[in-house]
């Protein structure tokens, strides 16, 4: 089957590889030519992923029968609706359903209206004085969020990016003046984790949990990035997530899909819940309407079921099953020096792919072009897969000497020490549990 993949990052390289492994004939449209995808694809179109007209032209030219949407920006523009109107079924939510990610105020009011478990106290404001008096009355630390897509970089939390609620009010005022409205939520203390599922609008199939490292530098310091790496465990859980917590988080995602269906906006594709595990259980921080990047790179190499079959099940409303190999994974992203604030661009990197293969690791290309020139964002994801976390981390780390260029990475991603730190943090927040093996 001819499948069009929209997007050209590390996440999309992992999707493309899984589609080809599952029997698809792959065609790609993205704004730059990803060297990994270029080898897998029968045809490659260069266009902005949000240029719906151009994407449709390529879809027609390649004669594709199915599309798979990688990033969130084209979903917001209604790419799935446009493809389906032109007779091409697509893996991804409609523009309206994608509002779970693209409109944070929509997502929170939807959860409230449908009594979805894992809700937070929130308010949406358009008026500066009302916002200021509510924050004063609330009296507890808050989180300030822009309403739309921010690439994970516009959210600010009191005690982290914001000193106190006074600073939160100033930032919220800035957003109201810029965007016309702002979302303010209670701050939840805990440890974050990623829960991704496949859904056809009715059935929900879970993937292994993952945890990412959003800060640029070691020990969770520095600016927030798209994610400097992530890990997953062989049992599909995480050391600090109990089976009960897992079931509660899954119930949040199932209830979401069911409520979307009942409201007449069926959600199909990948739904990704970013959860905060608090003392009282999992709380939904935000929805994402697509795979995580890097978290897609943890789970897709483990998928034993054909991704093409899963994709067909999603668009046909007949999702059957998704089996994953029981292995631990560690993904480390190599990013240009200076990322994310002032990244090096236009410089070439050298990759010894043969040596990478010999150490048993995998590589996924991201913000790098066909000439191996850095484009300014996270460039290459290296992945270790093994029975234990330690071995997976060792494999991922052993790739680093075989990639030469003006790059940096977080050495602590997926290390036992960093995972133990998260377990300790959870205990400090008053959660009583016996850590799962990883």
From Swiss-Prot:
Pathway: Purine metabolism; IMP biosynthesis via de novo pathway; N(1)-(5-phospho-D-ribosyl)glycinamide from 5-phospho-alpha-D-ribose 1-diphosphate: step 2/2. It catalyses: 5-phospho-beta-D-ribosylamine + glycine + ATP = N(1)-(5-phospho-beta-D-ribosyl)glycinamide + ADP + phosphate + H(+). Its cofactor is Mg(2+); Mn(2+). Keywords: ATP-binding, Ligase, Magnesium, Manganese, Metal-binding, Nucleotide-binding, Purine biosynthesis. Mn(2+) 2 binds at residues 286, 288. NCBIfam families: purD. Belongs to the GARS family. This is Phosphoribosylamine--glycine ligase. The lineage of its organism: Archaea, Methanobacteriati, Methanobacteriota, Thermococci, Thermococcales.
């Amino acid at each position: 089957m001819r499948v069009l993949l929209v997007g050209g990052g590390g996440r999309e390289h992992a999707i493309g590889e899984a589609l080809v492994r599952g029997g698809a004939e792959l065609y790609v449209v993205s704004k730059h030519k990803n060297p990994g995808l270029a080898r897998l694809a029968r045809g490659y179109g260069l266009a902005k992923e949000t240029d719906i007209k151009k994407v449709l032209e390529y879809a027609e030219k390649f004669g594709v029968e199915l599309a798979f949407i990688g990033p969130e920006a084209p979903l917001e523009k209604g790419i799935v609706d446009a493809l389906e109107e032109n007779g091409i079924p697509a893996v991804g939510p409609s523009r309206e359903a994608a509002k779970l990610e693209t409109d944070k105020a929509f997502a929170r009011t939807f959860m409230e209206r449908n009594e979805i478990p894992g809700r937070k106290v929130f308010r949406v404001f358009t008026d500066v004085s009302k916002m200021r008096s509510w924050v004063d009355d609330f009296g507890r630390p808050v989180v300030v969020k822009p309403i739309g897509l921010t690439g994970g970089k516009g959210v600010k939390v009191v005690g982290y990016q914001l000193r106190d609620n006074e600073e939160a009010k100033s930032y919220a005022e800035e957003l109201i003046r810029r965007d016309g409205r702002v979302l303010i939520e209670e701050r939840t203390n805990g440890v974050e984790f990623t829960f991704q599922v496949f859904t056809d609008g009715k059935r929900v199939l879970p993937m292994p949990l993952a945890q990412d490292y959003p800060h640029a530098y070691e020990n969770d310091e520095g600016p927030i990035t798209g994610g400097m790496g992530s890990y997953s465990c062989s049992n599909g859980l995480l050391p600090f997530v109990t089976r009960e917590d897992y079931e509660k988080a899954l119930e949040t995602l199932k209830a979401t899909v069911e409520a979307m269906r009942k409201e007449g906006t069926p959600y199909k594709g990948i739904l990704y819940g970013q959860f905060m595990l608090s003392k009282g259980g999992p709380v939904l921080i935000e929805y994402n309407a697509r795979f995580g990047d890097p978290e897609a790179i943890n789970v897709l190499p483990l998928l034993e079921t054909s991704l093409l079959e899963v994709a067909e099940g999603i668009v046909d409303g007949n999702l059957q099953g998704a089996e994953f190999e029981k292995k631990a994974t560690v993904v480390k992203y190599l990013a240009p020096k200076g990322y994310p604030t002032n990244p090096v661009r236009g410089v070439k990197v050298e990759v010894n792919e043969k040596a990478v293969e010999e150490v048993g690791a995998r590589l996924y290309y991201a913000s790098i072009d066909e000439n191996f020139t850095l484009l300014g964002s996270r460039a290459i994801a290296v992945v270790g897969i093994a029975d234990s976390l330690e071995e997976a981390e060792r494999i991922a780390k052993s790739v680093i000497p075989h990639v030469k260029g003006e790059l940096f990475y977080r050495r602590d991603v997926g290390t036992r020490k960093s995972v133990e730190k998260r377990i300790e943090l959870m205990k400090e927040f008053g959660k009583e549990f016996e850590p799962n093996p990883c």
